[in-house]
């Protein structure tokens, strides 16, 4: 690549990382250096853990973090549990038909989330699921399931069909073939699916603010603190919200292979 391309990449990376740098300033630098006077090219004048310690010792913030963690983990597990049979069934269909059905599954993600969230909130209020962990997880699964099915479809399509055929010839039934042959080979893709779904839930906002207003998750609480002018606590919470995503992004590079994504696009 030419020097101009390298310069362009450096500028792009700096542009993308600058918001994280400002977040670092507000979260770790004493307030007198940030809230009162924050400059675009400012260097950290001092480092303090006071803001982060204050956020982590706040019971409301701890409760929101635990709620986000619980909901995200539940969404990840549901995505795997529902995505495996969905994607495995799709992998047995002709590729064009599987692609068409996958596109239909993504239709829910194409609509504005608030269009779906309002009728769900009304239904959950009647079912006793409003402002509950399970209710919020089920709603967020509408977003996560198409993604998990898409990734797992690519995973199953990347497994050689000869292995399944040989197992069937040896007398293995459908479920035995799935659990003893297919799933062990797909474990990395399943792990990637769980992580992707977990991340989708971890920072999801629209369903959380409409379906869990009394017991908010981290994104909702950050919004509330920001609108009330509590920027230091909001910055510390944003840092807590961002850190797992950065770690999981690195892990996804290990588990998510190119053929998994490519497989879901065949047809």
Regions found by a protein language model. Give the residues of each.
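Transmembrane-helix boundary motif in ABC transporter permease subunits
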Residues: 1, 24, 71-105, 178
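N-terminal signal-anchor/first transmembrane alpha helix
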Residues: 1-28, 89, 99-105, 242-251, ...
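C-terminal transmembrane helix and the adjacent membrane-cytosol boundary/short C-terminal tail
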Residues: 3-5, 153-161, 165, 174, ...
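Faces of alpha-helical transmembrane segments in polytopic inner-membrane proteins
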Residues: 12-16, 75, 79-82, 105-117, ...
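Short membrane-interfacial helix/loop motifs at transmembrane-helix boundaries
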Residues: 18-59, 212-213, 259-267
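Membrane-interfacial helix termini and adjacent extracytoplasmic/periplasmic loops
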Residues: 41-42, 49, 98-99, 103, ...
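Interhelical loop and adjacent transmembrane-helix boundary motif
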Residues: 55, 59, 202-250, 257-258
């Amino acid at each position: 690549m030419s020097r101009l391309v390298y310069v362009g990449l450096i500028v792009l990376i700096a542009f993308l990382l600058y918001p994280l740098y400002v977040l670092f300033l507000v979260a770790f630098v004493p307030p007198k250096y940030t809230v009162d006077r924050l400059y675009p090219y400012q260097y950290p004048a001092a480092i303090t853990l006071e803001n982060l310690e204050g956020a982590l010792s706040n019971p409301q913030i701890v409760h929101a973090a635990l709620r986000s963690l619980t909901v995200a983990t539940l969404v990840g597990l549901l995505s795997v549990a529902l995505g495996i049979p969905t994607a495995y069934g799709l992998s047995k269909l002709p590729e064009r038909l599987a692609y068409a059905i996958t596109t239909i599954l993504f239709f829910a993600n194409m609509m504005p989330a608030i269009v779906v969230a309002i009728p769900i909130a009304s239904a959950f209020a009647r079912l006793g699921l409003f402002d509950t962990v399970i209710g919020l997880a089920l709603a967020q699964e509408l977003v996560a399931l198409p993604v998990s099915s898409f990734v797992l479809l690519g995973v199953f399509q990347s497994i050689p069909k000869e292995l399944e055929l040989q197992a069937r010839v040896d007398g293995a039934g459908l479920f035995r073939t799935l659990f003893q042959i297919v799933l062990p080979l797909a474990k990395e893709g399943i792990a990637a699916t769980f992580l992707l779904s977990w991340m989708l839930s971890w920072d999801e906002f629209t369903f959380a603010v409409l379906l869990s207003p009394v017991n908010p998750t981290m994104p909702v609480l950050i919004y509330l603190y920001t609108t009330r002018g509590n920027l230091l606590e909001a910055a510390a919470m944003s840092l807590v919200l961002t850190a797992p995503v950065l770690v999981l992004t690195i892990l996804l590079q290990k588990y998510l292979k190119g053929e998994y994504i490519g497989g879901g696009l065949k047809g």
